[in-house]
């Protein structure tokens, strides 16, 4: 795991997600969620099960990390439970780079037909921001005057 500056710092989707309201505490005053992460996996194509690297930002502190091992990224999330990990189009792509299909199948889920809204495993709530912001990242970025980054071909 390495610290990496400005990986996702300017992402409009990530800033918008952090502003989504949630119930912040249980009846006894303890936090329901201690941390909110936004993550993204980069791959050599459309195979989410073989990512090159993953990057995440902790929204409360703006700390950023890059992981070459997705098991390390998952352990990082699990070390901050209870937490929420958001990815844009995560339920159709990114989640499969972090969890295997058996874990996805066996975990607690909030579903709408075949659509996964939330998947919970080991205290981490994996959520898909595409259900809140139903645009591709390229159009979402453009709507707020930004550009979506592209992974260099040399990776």
Report residues per predicted region.
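N-terminal accessory regions of nucleic-acid-interacting proteins
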Residues: 1-37, 41
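Cross-family signature of deubiquitinases and ubiquitin-like deconjugating cysteine proteases
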Residues: 1-8, 12, 37, 47, ...
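Detector for Asparagine
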Residues: 6, 10, 19-22, 26, ...
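Intrinsically disordered, low-complexity regulatory regions enriched in Ser/Pro/Gly/Thr
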Residues: 29-32, 48-49, 78-80
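Short acidic, Gly/Ser-rich segments with clustered Asp/Glu that frequently serve as metal-coordination loops
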Residues: 41-49
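Conserved DEDDh/DEDDy metal-dependent 3′-5′ exonuclease domain
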Residues: 56, 60-155
């Amino acid at each position: 795991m390495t610290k990496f500056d400005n990986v996702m710092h300017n992402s409009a989707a990530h800033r918008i997600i952090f502003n989504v309201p949630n119930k912040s505490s249980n009846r006894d005053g303890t936090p329901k969620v201690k941390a909110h992460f936004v993550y993204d996996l980069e791959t050599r194509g459309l195979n989410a099960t073989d990512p090159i690297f993953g990057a995440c930002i902790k929204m409360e502190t703006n700390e950023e990390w890059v992981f070459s091992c997705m098991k390390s990224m998952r352990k990082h999330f699990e070390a901050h439970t209870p937490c929420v990990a958001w990815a844009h189009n995560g339920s159709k792509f990114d989640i499969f780079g972090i969890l295997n299909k058996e874990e996805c199948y066996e975990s607690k889920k909030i579903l709408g037909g075949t659509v996964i809204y939330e998947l919970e495993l080991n205290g981490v709530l994996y959520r898909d921001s595409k259900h809140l912001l139903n645009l591709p990242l390229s159009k979402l970025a453009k709507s707020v005057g930004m550009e979506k980054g592209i992974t260099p071909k040399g990776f």
